[in-house]
């Protein structure tokens, strides 16, 4: 299942389309690819008494995305009950390379890992945009500084370009996913000030 999970007005994740499809599925195993809030897969498994595995989608939105093809993936993560995960892995092993690293965990953990990825990438984009602004004021070439910076293998070059005519992050994934994890944090009494600052700064760029 890979259907949209748009952002609600309060920043939460709208999973109504996902649940509708789950309710209609009669297959022995459901692979859920859509990004959903933490706890959703477990909730649906119990509610509908179906075998559901969360195996997050990473295809991205550009033709240059490093994971645009399944054959480019070096790892896969599976979240759910063990019997369902075993069934899913058996299916995937018929199409993936034997050197692909497989990670298994409960669905809550894998759902959180997906949010961690997108929230971090959104934060990285805003960090680079702010550094770009500082470079501009100091008369420094951001791109030259960037090349030296990313030479450190700990940094990573993805999401470090800054586009003058399209500042901040956008698309259909990063905005809704960072908003969703902020919403989830607040529901359990956490004030995620860093992530909220990232969202607010991104709004300044729009």
What are these regions (language model features)?
Residues 1-206:
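Structural/interface elements that position substrates and couple domains in central-metabolism enzymes
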């Amino acid at each position: 299942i890979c259907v949209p999970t748009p952002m609600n007005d309060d920043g939460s994740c709208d999973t109504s389309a996902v649940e509708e499809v789950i309710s209609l599925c009669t297959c022995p195993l459901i692979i859920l690819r859509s990004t959903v809030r933490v706890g959703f897969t477990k909730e649906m498994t119990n509610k509908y008494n179906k075998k559901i595995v969360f195996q997050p989608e990473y295809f991205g939105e550009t033709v240059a995305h490093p994971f645009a093809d399944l054959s480019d993936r070096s790892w896969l993560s599976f979240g759910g009950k063990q019997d369902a995960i075993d069934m899913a892995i058996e299916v995937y092993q018929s199409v993936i390379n034997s050197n692909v690293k497989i990670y298994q965990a409960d669905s809550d953990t894998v759902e959180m890992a997906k949010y961690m990825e997108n929230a971090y990438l959104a934060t990285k984009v805003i960090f680079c945009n702010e550094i770009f602004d500082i470079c501009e004021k100091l008369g420094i070439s951001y791109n030259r500084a960037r090349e030296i910076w990313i030479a450190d293998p700990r940094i990573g070059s993805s999401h470090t370009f800054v586009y003058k005519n399209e500042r901040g992050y956008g698309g259909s994934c990063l905005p809704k996913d960072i908003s969703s994890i902020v919403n989830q944090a607040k529901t359990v009494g956490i004030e995620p000030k860093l992530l909220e600052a990232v969202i607010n700064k991104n709004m300044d760029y729009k």
